[in-house]
Amino acid sequence: MSNPITITESAQSHFAKLLAQQPEGTNIRVFVVNPGTQNAECGVSYCPPEAVEATDTEYPFSGFSAYVDGLSLPFLEEAVIDFVTDKMGSQLTLKAPNAKMRKVSDDASLMERVEYALQTQVNPQLAGHGGHVRLISISDDGVALVQFGGGCNGCSMVDVTLKEGIEKELLAQFAGELTAVRDSTEHDRGEHSYY
């Protein structure tokens, strides 16, 4: 797999100096908190050997490795870490243009763009309740059919979530393309249900 993160020579040199003062085997971790949301924040931290997870991806650089967790990885596509020096001093910069919302091309199908919005904007909010939603189809007259899962299935709040949250958000984002959002889920209340 190609490396989604560019670390400039000056930043690599800066990290190597910092890591030389850490216990042997310490590398760096690059991550995104709240990936795919407007609250996404990127960060870099030390990563001692015992903090490496089996699901991490390792990217070797000059004198150290950068570890990235699976959830952050797609949102760090095209990220650039640089160490810049100017009249004000020097600082590390991390630019991750896809952290808040990975772009789908503007000419992608309506189905792809709506699915993308559900995955990056709606599902992170539903995840707090153990729920998720997926797009089933879009009719010729612009009605998106969605299916809830996890904690949303059987939840008494699902109608409010659909009408006041998801439908409102999608109709605003896809004005002129979507006319309504409908729920195709057969809601069976159970222990998995949030409410």
Curated annotation (Swiss-Prot):
It comes from the Bacteria. Binds 1 [4Fe-4S] cluster per subunit. The cluster is presumably bound at the interface of two monomers. Homodimer. This is Fe/S biogenesis protein NfuA. GO terms for biological process: iron-sulfur cluster assembly; protein maturation. [4Fe-4S] cluster binds at residues 152, 155. Involved in iron-sulfur cluster biogenesis. Binds a 4Fe-4S cluster, can transfer this cluster to apoproteins, and thereby intervenes in the maturation of Fe/S proteins. Could also act as a scaffold/chaperone for damaged Fe/S proteins.
